[in-house]
């Protein structure tokens, strides 16, 4: 029923109402259905007496009809009549009133409430209203809209009370069937009988609490669909309090829990089917009558609705402007990934089980028979374990290191692609696990279910009904989650893309209004449902795997990341269910005390957990960084000893490196990557013409002073005279940071005559600017420090295409690799060689364009950094 937000403050004048034509009035006090009909102190109108008589007449069925099976059929027929009158009769009237104001127009057209109208119908209706509202009520002083609503209320009273009474008739007659089956302990174990009665009574009491709490909140105005006829002033929004904060549309959802409680008590599948049918019709009524009217009155304005649609469309840009595949939903024949997913799902859910069933009993391996059932089970478990580990590990790496995002940026691929491709991987893995689980059960079905292996095999129809209900619940919950957080949230988008201002807070709309993590339980209830239908050991193990992985992923992967991005206050905000339980079960004084004291420990506990993980990660990163930089941190003396240069102090052979730079006496001399290195040598007159000098990494040669045991890989030159010089450049250089040395070798062999002083090759450090306005200066620095040393021919200007110069190099691909590596090392922004020759597909990439791309990449990575996220949270 349409729900109004704020309870009006009780004043002597009562709440104010306004008709859709603009007339204002004071809304008089009215009574609820139960008090009106059954309270003897309240005066009854003629129509109310007729309603009571009709309700009592249902008892004639027990007196006039002697056969219980006939009674059941009569009551089912009566219930169907009143249920259809409710959902389609009242539904039709409300639809006409909501869209065309038909009921009010009919009253105006017939002058029903006109004092001069003395027709029988007019007099009866006015008499009914006077009896209902009391002698002080003046019909002419109130709008036709309000008086029409009062008449409509009596129609509702008749239909709703008759609907419930005939349903109780179905319950009683079915419970009486088969020698009082609902209490008969000879037909069922006593503990089961008592359990049924207790659980059923609990559901009925819960249903009663829902109805009473709902009525206390929304009053008669919304209970009788008052907002179809007029509006109460200052009630522009929907209410979310009490039971409305715990469940979506409680009058239509959990408000029918009592129906299933009656079915349990009656021990009747007939009652269960009738309850399901009635509940189903009620959901249709909600969807086609109630929700459209709620959206019209309380929903967003036209501009707001358009904005929401535009936001959803914009979100699709992360998925190539198409709705991504979820399971097999949004399937498109034009997407290769969708076709592959369909083939995979069909293969594992149908083809493999069908093939496996055909070789049961005949399959052998090395003469031994293979248990195909065990193989199918092992396959399902292996797939689920693989999916769990791969997705969890991947999300952790993405959360802390942005592994996937950096990989895409390094190849000049838009970061939106990282999310769209992740969505394909994620959906494929999830679909694979569900297909294998369905396939396992399909295999057992076509090979013949061994019911003896079930933990319980009674109540087949009940188990099937509850199992199907759980499966449908998971489908509905998943759909509701996507409606609330979109495909961006469904595929963990905030692990991959920077949060925008529109996503600076966690949503509390839709299903998230009632539960903080609806997927924690309901996200795998479909697996529970299938396990309930076929309760075998294999299914229980699979169900445990699904539930455990779901719990771990939400609490130790997703929640940790959410705290990092949105903050603990957002993540640990009470859900609607929690708020209502606190309000109902904990006194206000204690609740306030707990809320003030409880948040700090919670904060500390979760903070310590997240900080522990972050601390371990930071320590590991620091250790690796120090390890990589350890050569640069060695003292000059240690390096000399490490390279064993001191052993050749008095040698007749000598190598001098001419163009090294010096920064500190304690540190070795250095040059930058790509800079040509000039050496001079001297040796005795009688040296061999086959003497040669090679360039090596110190860490690879330190264990051998007298002989070099590794190849120079082309980084060498002949010594043709007693004195001379040579410039190592291009492919004869190392293109990575490290500590190096030159070695003088004798007679074309690897015996060492001299080892030069060690020196360092460093990458030039280039600071990437924060804004595009500094891109030209940045480009000039890139050209001078990176491109000029690497390319054989210097690039003419920063606006010249890079490819024109690189293509003139002797080693095209190697030059691209060197450029990419040096740019990555110098700027701290990792790119690949593909970045350089793919980036200029439409326009040839220049150094200036490259500098702009690097600035943009830096901005994206900074937006994804913990510091930026913390700054956004503070704002």
Curated annotation (Swiss-Prot):
Side Cytoplasmic, residues: 66-73, 176-189, 267-270, 361-376, 444-464, 548-875
Lumenal side: 1-44, 95-154, 211-245, 292-339, 398-422, 486-526
Protein name stated in the entry: Phosphatidylethanolamine N-methyltransferase
UniProt cross-references to Pfam families, sorted A to Z: PEMT
Class in the EC hierarchy, top level: transferase
Provenance organism: Meyerozyma guilliermondii (strain ATCC 6260 / CBS 566 / DSM 6381 / JCM 1539 / NBRC 10279 / NRRL Y-324) (Yeast)
Main function: Catalyzes the first step of the methylation pathway of phosphatidylcholine biosynthesis, the SAM-dependent methylation of phosphatidylethanolamine (PE) to phosphatidylmonomethylethanolamine (PMME).
Lineage of producing organism: Eukaryota, Fungi, Dikarya, Ascomycota, Saccharomycotina
Pathway: Phospholipid metabolism; phosphatidylcholine biosynthesis
Localisation per UniProt entry: Endoplasmic reticulum membrane
Designated gene of the protein: CHO2
GO-annotated biological processes: methylation; phosphatidylcholine biosynthetic process
InterPro entries: Phopholipid_MeTrfase, Phosphatid-EA_MeTrfase_fun
Lipid metabolism is among the record's keywords: yes
Keyword Methyltransferase among record annotations: yes
Keywords from the UniProt entry: Endoplasmic reticulum, Lipid biosynthesis, Lipid metabolism, Membrane, Methyltransferase, Phospholipid biosynthesis, Phospholipid metabolism, S-adenosyl-L-methionine, Transferase, Transmembrane, Transmembrane helix
Documented EC number(s): 2.1.1.17
